[in-house]
Amino acid sequence: MDGLVPGIVQDARTGEVLMLGFLNATSYAKTRETGFVTFWSRTRQKLWMKGETSGNRLRVISAATDCDNDALLFRVEVEGDGLVCHEGTVSCFTKPIAIPSQRQGPVVGDPGVRAEVNRG
């Protein structure tokens, strides 16, 4: 991904996923330095501190990597009015899509369904 890693932003209080952006080494260092999520804008080719203009900055409460160390999760507190998306919504994930169900019977995680582990 040309030195970019996806950064998922989640509300630390509610757990809601707010947005996805990309970070490079410079934006990651800036995030660590300031305590506010800073992305690399792929369209503008420059650093982008989310909320710097609107006042809805993303204060990092905690951060983690995924199991492959190729994605970041930021749990944040949103400053300002809390509207993270440029479309004026709390989350950027507001456009539902229909996906036909592929389920055939019970699935692990459903109530009463447990995974069986073969330790043989």
Enumerate the language-model features and the residues they cover.
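C-terminal binding/interaction regions
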Residues: 1-4, 12-13, 17-18, 23-120
